[in-house]
Regions:
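Glycine/small-residue-rich loop that forms an oxyanion/phosphate-binding "nest" at active or ligand-binding sites
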Residues: 68-117
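Short, small-residue alpha-helix embedded
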Residues: 124, 193-204
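Short, charged, surface-exposed secondary-structure boundary motifs
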Residues: 50-51, 125, 190-193
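Conserved N-terminal subdomain of the carbohydrate kinase-like
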Residues: 2-88
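Short pre-catalytic strand/loop immediately N-terminal to key active-site residues, enriched for Gly-Thr
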Residues: 179-195
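Short, small-residue-enriched loops and turns at beta-alpha junctions
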Residues: 64-67, 92-96, 169-170, 189
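General beta-strand structural signal in soluble alpha/beta enzymes
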Residues: 17, 39-41, 86-90, 114-119, ...
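Conserved phosphate/ATP/ADP-binding segment of small-molecule kinases
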Residues: 98-178
């Protein structure tokens, strides 16, 4: 891990974040601590220029608006055009049709390299379903169910899928047997706002 951080710092990638307004300052500081250079441009009018010079694009739908979604769409198109990696954090996707419709249309239009969400959020996208109770809602599922869901998402969208929770699951373009898990997550992470957002900001 130390070797990875040193390589990251030596490269100092520029990461464009259109992220949750609740945690935007924390995201910038975490990326700086990891050796990246964050930029938080949000105006649709500058998306092509900003995204075009970046090394990664981090999208988070946690605080949506028409303007922010339009900015994300423009940025994602530019990232896809230039083969810039895209991370999509599905925060609260099942809470409203507004969020769901945007995510589904974006996934239809561009290839996303990493999809990240809790179990309820990934399930909502796979099943096109609602989840009530806010952005922190998580379903309970055993290990095989969570792994199967992660693999379904990875296979459907041709990407890496990360399901976060008490145990994290990471699936690639693979069979279920190739889904990896990490059970070193802390339950305390669910007691503080934005810990999942912080995690997705480091995935570039």
């Amino acid at each position: 891990m130390n070797n990875f951080i040193e390589k990251l710092k030596s490269r100092s990638p520029l990461i464009h974040n259109i992220t949750n307004m609740v945690t935007i300052n924390d995201v910038a500081n975490i990326e700086l601590a990891c050796g990246a250079r964050p930029i938080m441009a949000m105006a649709p009018q500058e998306m092509d220029e900003v995204t075009g010079i970046c090394d990664g694009l981090n999208l988070n739908i946690g605080t949506p608006s028409e303007e922010r979604f339009e900015a994300m769409r423009i940025a994602a198109r530019m990232a896809a055009k230039k083969n810039i990696p895209i991370v999509l954090d599905l925060v609260g996707v099942g809470v409203s049709r507004f969020r769901m419709d945007f995510v589904m249309s974006l996934l239809d239009e561009v290839h996303v390299d990493v999809i990240k969400g809790n179990l309820s959020e990934v399930k909502a996208v796979i099943e096109h379903s609602r989840c009530d109770g806010g952005v922190e809602v998580t379903d309970t599922a055993d290990e095989s169910d969570a792994k199967a869901l992660a693999c379904r998402a990875a296979l459907r969208y041709g990407c890496i899928c990360v399901i976060t929770g008490e145990t994290d699951y990471v699936a690639e373009l693979c069979d279920e047997a190739d889904c990896y898990d990490n059970n070193e997550s802390s339950q305390m992470s669910t007691d503080a706002t934005g810990t999942g957002v912080h995690f997705s900001s480091t995935m570039q």
